[in-house]
Amino acid sequence: MNRQALVCRNILEKPDITQREMAKNMDISLGTVNGLVKECLAEGYIAEEENGKEKYLILLEKGKELLKPYKVDGALIIAAGFGSRFVPLTFETPKGLLEVFGERMIERQIKQLHEVGIHDITIAVGYLKEKFEYLIDKYDVKLLYNPEYSCKNTLATVYRARKFLKGRNVYILSSDNWMRENMYHSYECGAWYSAAHEEGETKEWCLTFNKKGRISDVNVGGKDAWFMYGP
């Protein structure tokens, strides 16, 4: 994860952002953010300006160039499965088309992606694929059919989309996630997997990290652990 690029992204998204807000966004200490800001100033990615008594950071052209390789090109939304855990709701409706607070989950995700400028969206379909066809006209998305949806898992669906993914920065999402806040960005400065922390025992899929914060192992069940959660 390029943390200097993350600093630049924070400033791009919120020009009046404080270092304290940046620390919260990046889940690191204020001191670490202060050090990263100094690095970015020294590299010429950002500059500091004053407005009266207040100081603020601005993103320079060199900082924008730093962000370019991290531009998100598109999103693949996995919507091929039957959704057995949602039975009987999914007998006639695919799980991604179920409503939460009066809004279909997959439509909310599409809108959130559009909000950050991501419009190249492919939906991988299988079960009741015809139910998703209205999204083509409504949101200008593409549908990719996986005929093996009933006998193979999500990895097989992702493999079907390999041409769409190859050489590109792409979100891989599940159709049945509902996020109150928009967690997507125009730029992603490294690969990541969404997770939540659980105190005490859990039977979820728990993640193990190495010293660089990269996922090194996944196990079912754990204690006081980060587990797979969300897109």
Language model regions located:
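A short, conserved structural fragment
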Residues: L41-N51
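N-terminal glycine-rich phosphate-binding loop and ensuing alpha1 helix
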Residues: K62-K129
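Conserved beta-loop-beta/alpha segment of the NTase-like Rossmann-fold superfamily
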Residues: E130-K211
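Short amphipathic alpha-helical interface segments
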Residues: M1-I17, K24-N25
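Key DNA-contact positions within bacterial/archaeal DNA-binding proteins
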Residues: G31
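Short, cationic-aromatic polyanion-contact patches
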Residues: M1-R3, T18, N51-P69
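Catalytic-core segments of class I nucleotidyltransferases/pyrophosphorylases
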Residues: K212-P231
